[in-house]
Amino acid sequence: MIRQISNIKRDTLLLTLALPVAATQAGEFTTWGNDQGLDIFFDYSSEVMSNVSGGERSGTGYNGLASFGLEADLGQPLGWEGTSLKLSGMDLHGSGIGSRVGDMMGVSNIEGYGSVRLYESWVEKTFEAQSLSLRAGLLLADEEFSTLDTAGAFLNATFGWPEFISMNTVNNGPAFYIPALGARLLWEPNEALYAQIGVFDGDSFDSPYGDDSVN
């Protein structure tokens, strides 16, 4: 739903400070896990933003995002060649400055409902002879569709999931920070060519009101 914004000053000045922290593949357990086709990961990103002038009101906000989980090659422990697994969760916390700025698209690309939730979790099967892979589970469409690798360098959410999709889909569609049940088929005959198709639950909240308590 598009929000109508009124009585907002034209000039808005933002001060931002982003503090990304990443901790991956650390410790003896993770080293052992890698030998068994297991990768345990933890990433933390935080940011402080201030609306100094303009917008709806001035003020400062803080956002934090912790991502954690594991990825496993099931060929080594179970003999399921070409099969991989991902289980992940996330912790969103803090209070951003979106309401202070009066934005339609997020000023921050890590802002969302404060919650600890199950995140991307799927099983993928690769068929090497046909150059195909099939992935199914809790998926994010913006991980593989309508996105650019270079967009990760920017803070503003307009560089991520396109507005023409989010504004015309119930509860923004299957994108950060709510995955949806779905499946994706990828055909990649070589490094220069690929085609893919995906099917996703159209309402990842399963609620027309976007109630964050549903998930």
Predicted regions and their residues:
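Bacterial N-terminal signal peptides that target proteins for export
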Residues: 2-13
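Residues on the lipid-exposed face of transmembrane beta-strands in outer-membrane beta-barrel proteins
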Residues: 42, 68-74, 120-125, 136, ...
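Surface-exposed coil loops of outer-membrane beta-barrel proteins
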Residues: 97-120, 130-215
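Short loop/turn motifs that connect adjacent beta-strands in outer-membrane beta-barrel proteins
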Residues: 25-39, 73-85, 128-131, 192
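Residues that define the transmembrane beta-barrel architecture of outer-membrane proteins
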Residues: 36, 48-50, 60-66, 115-119, ...
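Transmembrane beta-strand segments of Gram-negative outer membrane beta-barrel proteins
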Residues: 30-52, 83-87, 95, 157, ...
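Outer-membrane beta-barrel biogenesis signature
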Residues: 23-39, 140-154
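Transmembrane beta-barrel strands of outer-membrane/channel proteins
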Residues: 40-48, 85-91, 134-140, 195-201
